């Protein structure tokens, strides 16, 4: 009876499942390393199958932007650096090489040495011409007082002045030639100079008082007599 009761109680109880086997720590880390290696190999094969994209170029930064320091306290230093870079000869040469024809204007080209020398000679010539006209203006009548005379007026006044001087020289030469030829020689009369002065001072009275003693003067002698009144 007791054995049959034990068999019934044992049949009524369910059998327990076997407990899982727990591996040691070394086996766990080896399994994790193998799984990581398999994942890396799968990722590498996937990258090889995908088309390779072109490498992206790094953005180029201008030297002016790189040289500017950050912060509000360094703004003055940044402005000075930018001003120095803008006035550097290398940057100016780069600006000259730029083509601005598409914008409707162009930068002035640097003149060659021959053109610079020619311009310098032209400036010196104009300066000398102006100095010459200033000197001529001082020698013509009323030229020193009128400093606003134009070049044309200065030349015209100089021509008139030269003609007047030439006329005086011609008349003086004519008088000298007449004296040398004996037409107005002082040996004609011992009191020639006194008579000439008296005729120059009062010709009407001398003619009226001594009409019988003097012959009428020729037109040439009368012209010479008028010339002596200038002195």
From Swiss-Prot:
Q: Which InterPro entries match?
A: bHLH_dom, HLH_DNA-bd_sf, MASH1/Ascl1a-like
**SUPFAM superfamilies for the chain:** HLH, helix-loop-helix DNA-binding domain
User: What does it do?
Assistant: Transcription factor that plays a key role in neuronal differentiation: acts as a pioneer transcription factor, accessing closed chromatin to allow other factors to bind and activate neural pathways. Directly binds the E box motif (5'-CANNTG-3') on promoters and promotes transcription of neuronal genes. The combination of three transcription factors, ASCL1, POU3F2/BRN2 and MYT1L, is sufficient to reprogram fibroblasts and other somatic cells into induced neuronal (iN) cells in vitro.
The record describes its quaternary structure and partners as: Efficient DNA binding requires dimerization with another bHLH protein. Forms a heterodimer with TCF3.
GO molecular function terms noted in the UniProt entry: bHLH transcription factor binding; chromatin binding; DNA-binding transcription factor activity; DNA-binding transcription repressor activity, RNA polymerase II-specific; E-box binding; identical protein binding; protein dimerization activity; sequence-specific DNA binding
Source domain of life: Eukaryota
GO BP terms in the entry: adrenal chromaffin cell differentiation; carotid body glomus cell differentiation; cell maturation; cellular response to magnetism; central nervous system neuron development; cerebral cortex development; cerebral cortex GABAergic interneuron differentiation; commitment of neuronal cell to specific neuron type in forebrain
Give the residue ranges for region: Disordered: 1-24, 39-92
Q: Which protein, by its recorded name, is this?
A: Achaete-scute homolog 1
* Ranges of compositional bias, category Basic residues: 76-85
What are the record keywords, sorted? Acetylation, Activator, Developmental protein, Differentiation, DNA-binding, Neurogenesis, Nucleus, Transcription, Transcription regulation
């Amino acid at each position: 009876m007791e054995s049959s009761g034990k068999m019934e109680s044992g049949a009524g109880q369910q059998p327990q499942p076997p407990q899982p086997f727990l591996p040691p720590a070394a086996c766990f880390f080896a399994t994790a390393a193998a799984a990581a290696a398999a994942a890396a190999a799968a990722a590498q094969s996937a990258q090889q199958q995908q088309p390779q994209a072109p490498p992206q170029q790094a953005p180029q930064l201008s030297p002016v932007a790189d040289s500017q320091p950050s912060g509000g306290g360094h703004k003055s230093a940044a402005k000075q650096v930018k001003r120095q870079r803008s006035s550097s000869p290398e940057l100016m040469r780069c600006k000259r090489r730029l083509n601005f024809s598409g914008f409707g204007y162009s930068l002035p080209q640097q003149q060659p040495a021959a053109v610079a020398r020619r311009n310098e000679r032209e400036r010196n010539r104009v300066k000398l011409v102006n100095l010459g006209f200033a000197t001529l203006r001082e020698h013509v009548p009323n030229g020193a007082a009128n400093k606003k005379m134009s070049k044309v007026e200065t030349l015209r006044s100089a021509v008139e002045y030269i003609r007047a001087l030439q006329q005086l020289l011609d008349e003086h030469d004519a008088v000298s030639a007449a004296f040398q030829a004996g037409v107005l020689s002082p040996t004609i009369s011992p009191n020639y100079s006194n008579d000439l002065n008296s005729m120059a001072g009062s010709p009407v009275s001398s003619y009226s008082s001594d009409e019988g003693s003097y012959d009428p003067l020729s037109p040439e002698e009368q012209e010479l007599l008028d010339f002596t009144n200038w002195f």
